Amino acid sequence: MALPSDPDHDARETLRLIGPDPQNWVPDREGIDHNVFVVGGGQTGATFAFALRRAGIGKVTVIDAAPDEGKAGIWLTHARMNRLRTPKGLPGPELGLPGLSFQSWYEARHGAEAYAGFDRIARTDWANYLKWYRDFLGIGIRYGTRLLRIEPADGYLRLHLDAGGTPLIETARKIILANGFGGSGGPMIPAVPAALPQGFVAHSSAAIDFASLKGKAVAVVGSAASAFDAAGTALEAGAQSVRLFARRTSIASVPINRVRGYPGAYDNYPRLPDPVRWRQALRFREAGSTPPPDAVERVVRHKNFHLHLGAPWTNADIDGGKVVTDIGAETFAFDFVIAGTGYFADPTRKPEFSNFAASIRLWRDQYAPAEGELDEFFGAHPYLGLGHEFLEKALGEAPFLRNIHVFNPGGFVSFGLPIGDVPSIRRDVPAVVARISRDLFLADLDSHESRITGSHPAEFGEEAYASAVWRPAQTIAAE
């Protein structure tokens, strides 16, 4: 089948059919720079910009700490998988508009047969689609701008920013934290490798120079997808050997979250009772985060790859310029160690929240697990409202927290998904936008009540129906 001469035709037709964007209905407030301030210009930040526009909410800005588009997000930086880990057909940034979907974009450029030929999207194709999405929809991102601190003020939030070394202070009524895995916490490295000197160890999220690992002995600690991706990248870069060390006695292979992927569970999960959500989080943790099959195949095809099961690191030293560790009865030496060990979530440890961190309600403040179900890791996650907003630890202590919406993996326990990943977009982006719309509308209710009870010019006069007005016979006779 011939490819269309205009690959953007369906996307343009989609926008034509849904009609023009609504005008901004949010009244201006003196001293307020932004109605909504989105932190993070990746796939969810761009999606929020479009969703808010379609909701008629103006004065929205999106920032990203990366210096430019090419270094923003994970897909062209520290994401190292060959293909996305989720099925290709999951709804994403298109927000129910087929002409803006990845499938439509891809088929317009490569054909329907090419799309049918794979089950998961190539990482670089996804990055190219997101670039097109931003460009086609005219979504501007302020690159090189970092959020340093949020300061509550009287009826708004004061944002302390760093724009390429220039300090800025801007104001906003609402904030969306669409800033990825580190947005509510940071990289998690086990204590033993974390104690190694700089230059010998890096978290998988770091900008690792894999070319420099050619001919080197590399250790990877961890057994989730990011660990296998790092191992595969090191092997393909020419590492002499790569050994992956897993605490588990077998690699997690059951994607436990998929059993609740049906609409009833997916749509209603945020409203489940706390004990159910807590037990589901524990179930996920016990089952383990699964690498996709191709990530495992990518490494095991190399003869210089070795997998160590039931092998946590309990010691490590530097000897002769090498990292030396004893695992069981064996001693191993490495030139470099990569920790593919995930992230922690704990907003009390984030400098951006230093003005009010103690007031944020966490799961450990909200829910007391039964004996045998305690988990410090999940207890440190924020306990979020249905609009992904922070909640106060004590009622009335910090009411401004409801204006900070968390759209990053810190919402995992509350919403049952790694928030910010593709599976979270269809359900949770509209929920956040609806809550922001409601809050902004009700906060300006006096203005809106005046507007909705105001006068409107008539669309026609009495002459439009005068000829059809029934006139009883006695009325005519009396004339």
Give each language-model segment a name.
Residues 93-127:
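A conserved beta-strand/loop capping segment in the N-terminal third of enzymes
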Residues 51, 65, 82-102, 106, ...:
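Long, low-complexity, intrinsically disordered N-terminal extensions of eukaryotic proteins, enriched
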Residues 66-94, 252-268:
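Conserved N-terminal glycine-rich FAD pyrophosphate-binding loop of Rossmann-like flavoproteins
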Residues 80, 86, 98, 126-129, ...:
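Generic hydrophobic, aliphatic-rich segments that mediate packing or membrane embedding
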Residues 1-66, 115-237, 243-479:
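Flavin (primarily FAD) cofactor-binding/catalytic cores of flavoenzymes
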